[in-house]
């Protein structure tokens, strides 16, 4: 299973092509759109989300509500393109029009792709970098993740996400499965502990008032993953390694950990390894989940717990120092419309990125042309956990 996205932030649309989804998976546009809507929410979002509707159109790979096994194409229309038609149009323009073009960017933002991307691709107008490096592209990745979640749910694998920390205000690092899944989306900061939700909002408001931005930590949980997905044999097949790459590829994400994460460095081995037990009904299990559902790069049947660290968004309304690439003079960086805090929305993005990595790994482990074949193989693997 793989995918490709295309489109610019203020271009006409985002396009996704997903290859490798088995035939006969029931997919409805409204189910994908529910996930798209979650990404648009969250306290601290900017004005852009009031413009966009982010509803997807399925244009190939699905017939009468079921996948065909051929590539699936999804389209997300950028409603804001109506205001950018001249600036972001594909038709050639004259040199005079280019010189007088509005919204040209020559003052790169520290922490963004602007300057290095301009150097690498020889763009003198850094908007050519900004448009693709923008987090707008994550709308396409959520669409991919939504399809992945639909697939996983047919296998009784379920994903949830939450915010753990915003601007130094922290919730508990770990919750039990029921507490986690029964308390997502309770509030607009996506934190489980309601007592700190307002503190997080106040912190976001403070950053916005100061023209600044703040980051945080998000957590994703995947429940009921079958054992043995991934591999200890080769580095590139380790499931936690693949998830780590996927998570840090999300815009502004700077770190990833599993289970108790970096706290493992503070504890002795006797307190961080998860002891193995056996039950005749359910098979092998662990009473604890310090390692976040992984052993040796493989899923061990416990809930998979992924933590992602998001830095503050680099676009600031009180911009930092920069240099104009044309004059080489000191200037304040360009101000572009942005969020003061996107951590709640980023938790949704992270959930869908993890969903894709899990779906991809499952389909590699249990190669199947259609859903009945896949379901049967998953059932057999789960039985192995009892009979081995």
From Swiss-Prot:
Cofactor(s) named in the record: FMNH2
EC number, UniProt record: 4.2.3.5
Keyword Protease included in the entry's annotation: no
Annotated binding of FMN, by residue: 132-134, 251-252, 296, 311-315, 337
An example Gene Ontology CC term for this record: cytosol
Highest taxon above the source species: Bacteria
Pfam family, one: Chorismate_synt
EC category name: lyase
Catalytic activity: 5-O-(1-carboxyvinyl)-3-phosphoshikimate = chorismate + phosphate
Gene Ontology biological process: amino acid biosynthetic process; aromatic amino acid family biosynthetic process; chorismate biosynthetic process
Signal peptide positions on this chain: none
Molecular function GO terms recorded: chorismate synthase activity; FMN binding
Pathway recorded for this protein: Metabolic intermediate biosynthesis; chorismate biosynthesis; chorismate from D-erythrose 4-phosphate and phosphoenolpyruvate: step 7/7
Record's function text: This reaction introduces a second double bond into the aromatic ring system.
Protein name: Chorismate synthase
Originating organism: Staphylococcus epidermidis (strain ATCC 35984 / DSM 28319 / BCRC 17069 / CCUG 31568 / BM 3577 / RP62A)
